[in-house]
């Protein structure tokens, strides 16, 4: 069987996903293609979905700005994606479109690959910076993993509170409080767009401990200003391009049932991004 896979979103011309998934196909000895299907805001999203429904597809990824919009066109949505309110992976089985979200599991896999000593140690104190879709996915993945000491800091507090919901073991705080309390956290995860293609950090990092693990899910630039500041305080740095790799791995598993070996791919992605 030849797999037919796509990525829908806008803009996506510089996406790493085709390279990643075509590498997965090679490593798994599977035949198939992974192609971009760009839908600009000026186009009818519904018409494009109709076109996709008429084509022979194995599945597709969904990225911004369509991770919520796609949900109304799906036949089923798995519990995790429903909880997150967003879908980034669609599998097509017997004509049914089934939605998933691999953001959270992708983040955890990438974190544990970088720092195996964190796996199973769920009493760590965690700070999530930002309250968008990625923060929601990562928060629920951490909660499902058993983490019970999580704070979410955001400029608009109500957005952080909406992610936490009724979870009694999590707390929404301001960015100012987060900067003051930084020394209390074992893991700090930057999920906002601040620092994407600009030398800015969402908060001052002067109070980070030397054994704190610091993540930034932004991968353009490869090393954000946030991570550059963190490196002055701690050696435990976790780059965003690795989350991209592992959320893709989880999507590929959904489509193919194959647990693809990603060994060395993080370094290859790093080299490609450095060349841009």
Curated annotation (Swiss-Prot):
Enzyme class, UniProt record, top EC level: oxidoreductase
Pathway(s) of this molecule: Metabolic intermediate biosynthesis; chorismate biosynthesis; chorismate from D-erythrose 4-phosphate and phosphoenolpyruvate: step 4/7
Pfam families membership: SDH_C, Shikimate_DH, Shikimate_dh_N
Reaction(s) the record says it catalyses: shikimate + NADP(+) = 3-dehydroshikimate + NADPH + H(+)
GO cellular component: cytosol
Domain of life: Bacteria
The name this protein goes by in its record: Shikimate dehydrogenase (NADP(+))
Organism: Oceanobacillus iheyensis (strain DSM 14371 / CIP 107618 / JCM 11309 / KCTC 3954 / HTE831)
